[in-house]
Amino acid sequence: LGKRMRIARAMPNTAIAVRESMTCIASNGPDDKALEMAKLLFNDVGKTLRIREEDMLAATALGACGIAYFLRAIRAASQGGIEVGLSAKNSLAMAVQTAKGAACLLSVGGTHPESEIDKVTTPNGCTISGLNCMEHEGFSSAMIRGITVSAEKAARLYRKE
């Protein structure tokens, strides 16, 4: 397309439907109008983050595919609630609001996940017991590996174009 043509590439996610997308935007110019126009458009339907073009595949895996991973975690939490006796309706409502609250603690408070986790864990408590069980079952490793595999697949699909 040449250097005179300014292009902004955007990768939103499906939360765009409720104006809560995380849209990553890359541009072929350092300070171009295409980028500003894209940011203006996508800021209306969520948050935007300017990234380097070479980070777009990783952003696809985390920002676009990642929404499914967080939804799967919410579904699993809801199923756990049902397993311990909650109704399906109440369990899903609790899982959804708890996930939303956790995300807000980080986005509004600007804290790191571990500092928020530390606030709810107590020695010999039920939270640390549950966290340790999840880690022994591979929770973090599975999430990390899923994102890595998605980025690898995105790279293969991109090369086919």
PLM features: residue spans?
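Active-site capping/gating segments
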Residues: 9-24
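Internal alpha-helical scaffold of NAD(P)-dependent oxidoreductase catalytic cores
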Residues: 2-6, 22-59, 69-109, 153-157
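Thr-Gly-centered strand-to-loop micro-motif
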Residues: 26, 65, 130
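NAD(P)-dependent Rossmann-like dehydrogenase/reductase catalytic/cofactor-binding core
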Residues: 96-161
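Short pre-catalytic strand/loop immediately N-terminal to key active-site residues, enriched for Gly-Thr
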Residues: 8, 56-61, 113-118
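A generic short alpha-helical patch detector that favors 3-5-residue windows
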Residues: 65-69, 93-94, 119-122
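A short acidic, helix-capping loop that chelates divalent metal ions and anchors anionic groups
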Residues: 17-21, 58-60, 129
